[in-house]
């Protein structure tokens, strides 16, 4: 069939054009194309080894979603495996081969001093010493204490010697154990971080084990307590050897050591109760021992409340060396610790009774000694301790009023430590004169530093940035600055550039008033009077009394390194306990700083305030 296209082309229907149209249509049909591809793939699979299809199989790898050149595929897989093996090998080398880490920063001066301060307690141990005691010039001593006394006739071996002599005074010894325990309860993580936790706990147990021997600790009710072992009074004349009449190493003592008991001694009993109660919290994970301490503490506090009186009657050895001025502060102090150890509200009621606070001197704000924390006056420590209770538990009625009073009084005490208020004088070198210029000032200085540092940590833990002194607000850093300034003075930042901790720094006292340190450990026994030649010599002590805090400078920052003048050079157990507590509170380590908020409350039940009494009936 023919025709003419109006545009000049033929109108003939061509079969060739029809075929081309079919091809175009097939190109648009992808399903048909895929069917052809499937047939091709089947031919590859069915082809023999000599066929061209077999050659293609060797050259390509079909992954389903794509077809890859076999060489490229194998190279890629090999590379990935090689890189993986190399990385694994490197990681294994890094883990297995020891590599050097940057050394930790050197400990600060407070940590260094703390290690030494604890060693002083090792040097003061009485009785059979452990092999790891670490003081080469000390040995077993006074192994018959109590057994040779015709009245007591029981073992009083152990405990700590008080100072440069060999007397064991329970009153300052118990306070020292309370202070060490308090510092562990608040700063356990710090002790652990510097490797001293086991050491300080061992020292506390050494003290509390001895205190448990000094009364009938297995009874619920007692009628007497041992107050001290040994005698120091030489004022009565005569040639009766005792711990002050003689100058001997404790290991060589052969003179009688009398035991002094008391039958009405509320101050001593309550302080010993505080020591055992605080230690029971330290050892709460050792339930048997902790329970033993609590039982003893209950008996002691009960005895103190029932048998009223001071442990240091006029003219006694106790009154000469560690006179107690009152027992009311011990009732508050001991009651607070008994409450924390037992959770029994009866003890808290005693500690917070308004009459108790009044008798303890809580309202004697004009007293020159208000706020001076010592082995004799525990009120400032009790106020801080009970302020802690209010800050973190807020027990409410009926305790809130007196707790708020204690809290406000603690704020006032902290204000009194600041130089701008002139509550206490300061030496030109910067030492606060809490004992008003009298001798042996450092024991009071370190106690104040501890309370200030601890209270600042309490405020921080309670998210309280500071406190008010009248209309003026001060941050907690002001308290820490005060505490650091006092410890820095003790450690050498003073006009004499003298460290008052033996063995710390380049310049420290070489002639501590101490029998054991001053007499050579050379196998020679020097008798009662034979040792005095070592007391009088101007040579340095042959044995270094590591960590001992000496009595300190005078009010003009002057110091005499003279063995015979105990007002400058004698260390004491109580002073070193305050030093340890202050140092650990300011130690700067790379662990969680601040206090342990909760451990002290581990025995305290949840607080459900007692509702106030109903109002009286209305009458028209």
UniProtKB/Swiss-Prot annotation:
PROSITE patterns with a match to the protein in the record: GH9_1 (PS60032), GH9_2 (PS00592), GH9_3 (PS00698)
Residues of this chain annotated as glycosylated in UniProt: 216, 314, 323, 344, 408, 425, 567
GO molecular function, one term: cellulase activity
Stretches the record annotates as Disordered: 1-26
Enzyme Commission numbers on file: 3.2.1.4
Stated family: Belongs to the glycosyl hydrolase 9 (cellulase E) family.
Transmembrane segment boundaries: 72-92
Subcellular location field: Membrane
InterPro entries, alphabetized: 6-hairpin_glycosidase_sf, 6hp_glycosidase-like_sf, Glyco_hydro_9, Glyco_hydro_9_Asp/Glu_AS, Glyco_hydro_9_His_AS
Protein name: Endoglucanase 10
Record-level GO cellular component terms: membrane
Residues the record marks as active site: 165, 513, 561, 570
Tissue specificity: Ubiquitous.
SUPFAM superfamilies listed in its UniProt record: Six-hairpin glycosidases
Membrane topology classification: Single-pass type II membrane protein
Top-level taxonomic group: Eukaryota
UniProt entry keywords in alphabetical sequence: Carbohydrate metabolism, Cell wall biogenesis/degradation, Cellulose degradation, Glycoprotein, Glycosidase, Hydrolase, Membrane, Polysaccharide degradation, Signal-anchor, Transmembrane, Transmembrane helix
Pfam family, one: Glyco_hydro_9
Enzyme class: hydrolase
UniProt-listed Gene3D superfamilies: 1.50.10.10
Species whose genome carries this gene: Oryza sativa subsp. japonica
Membrane recorded as keyword: yes
Catalytic activity from the UniProt record: Endohydrolysis of (1->4)-beta-D-glucosidic linkages in cellulose, lichenin and cereal beta-D-glucans
Annotated GO biological process: cell wall organization; cellulose catabolic process
């Amino acid at each position: 069939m023919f025709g003419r296209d109006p545009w000049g082309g033929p109108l003939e229907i061509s079969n060739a054009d029809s075929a081309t149209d079919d091809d175009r249509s097939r190109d648009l049909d992808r399903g048909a194309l895929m069917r052809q591809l499937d047939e091709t793939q089947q031919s590859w699979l069915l082809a023999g080894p000599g066929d061209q299809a077999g050659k293609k199989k060797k050259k390509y790898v079909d992954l389903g979603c794509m077809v890859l050149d076999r060489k490229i595929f194998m190279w890629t897989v090999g590379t990935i495996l090689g890189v993986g093996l190399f990385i694994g090998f490197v990681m294994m080398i890094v883990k297995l081969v020891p590599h050097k880490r940057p050394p930790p920063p050197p400990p600060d001066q407070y940590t260094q001093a703390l290690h030494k301060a604890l060693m002083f307690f090792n040097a003061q141990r009485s009785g059979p010493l452990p092999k790891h005691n670490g003081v080469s010039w000390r040995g077993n001593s006074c192994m018959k204490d109590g057994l040779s006394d015709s009245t007591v006739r029981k073992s009083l071996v152990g405990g700590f010697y008080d100072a440069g002599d060999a007397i064991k005074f329970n009153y300052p010894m118990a306070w020292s154990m309370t202070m060490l325990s308090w510092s562990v309860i608040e700063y356990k993580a710090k002790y652990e971080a510097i490797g001293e936790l086991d050491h300080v706990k061992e020292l506390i147990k050494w003290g509390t084990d001895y205190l448990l021997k000094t009364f009938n600790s297995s009874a619920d009710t007692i009628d007497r307590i041992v107050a001290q072992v040994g005698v120091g009074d030489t004022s009565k004349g005569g040639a009766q050897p005792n711990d002050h009449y003689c100058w001997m190493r404790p290991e060589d003592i052969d003179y009688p050591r009398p035991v002094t008991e008391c039958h009405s001694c509320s101050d001593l009993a309550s302080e010993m109760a505080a020591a055992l109660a605080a230690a029971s919290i330290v050892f709460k994970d050792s339930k048997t021992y902790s329970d033993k301490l609590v039982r003893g503490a209950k008996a002691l506090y009960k005895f103190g409340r029932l048998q009223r009186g001071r442990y240091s009657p006029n003219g006694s050895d106790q009154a000469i060396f560690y006179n107690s001025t009152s027992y009311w502060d011990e009732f508050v102090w001991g009651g607070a610790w008994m409450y924390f150890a037992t959770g029994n509200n009866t003890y808290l009621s005693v500690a917070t009774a308004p009459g108790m606070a009044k008798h303890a001197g809580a309202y004697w704000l004009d007293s020159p000694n208000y706020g001076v924390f010592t082995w004799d006056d525990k009120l400032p420590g009790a106020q801080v301790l009970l302020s802690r209770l209010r800050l973190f538990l807020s027990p409410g009625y009926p305790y809130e009023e007196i707790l708020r009073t204690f809290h406000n009084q603690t704020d006032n005490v902290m204000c009194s430590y600041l130089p701008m208020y002139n509550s206490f004088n300061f030496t030109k070198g910067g030492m606060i004169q809490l004992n008003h210029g009298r001798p042996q000032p450092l024991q009071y200085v370190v106690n104040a530093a501890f309370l200030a540092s601890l209270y600042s940590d309490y405020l921080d833990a309670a998210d309280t940035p500071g406190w008010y002194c009248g209309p003026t607000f001060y941050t907690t850093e002001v308290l820490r600055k005060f505490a650091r300034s006092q410890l820095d003075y003790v450690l050498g930042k003073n006009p004499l550039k003298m460290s008052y901790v033996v063995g710390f720094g380049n310049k420290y006292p070489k002639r501590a008033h101490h029998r054991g340190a001053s007499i050579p450990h050379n196998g020679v026994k020097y008798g009662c009077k034979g040792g005095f030649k070592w007391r009088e010599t101007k040579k340095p002590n042959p044995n270094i009394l590591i960590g001992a805090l000496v009595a300190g400078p005078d009010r003009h920052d002057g110091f005499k390194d003279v063995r015979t003048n105990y007002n400058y050079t004698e260390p004491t157990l109580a002073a070193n306990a305050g030093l340890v507590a202050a140092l650990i509170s300011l130690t700067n380590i790379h662990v969680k700083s601040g206090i342990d908020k909760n451990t002290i409350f581990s025995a305290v039940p949840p607080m459900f305030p007692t509702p106030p009494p109903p109002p009286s009936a209305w009458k028209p």
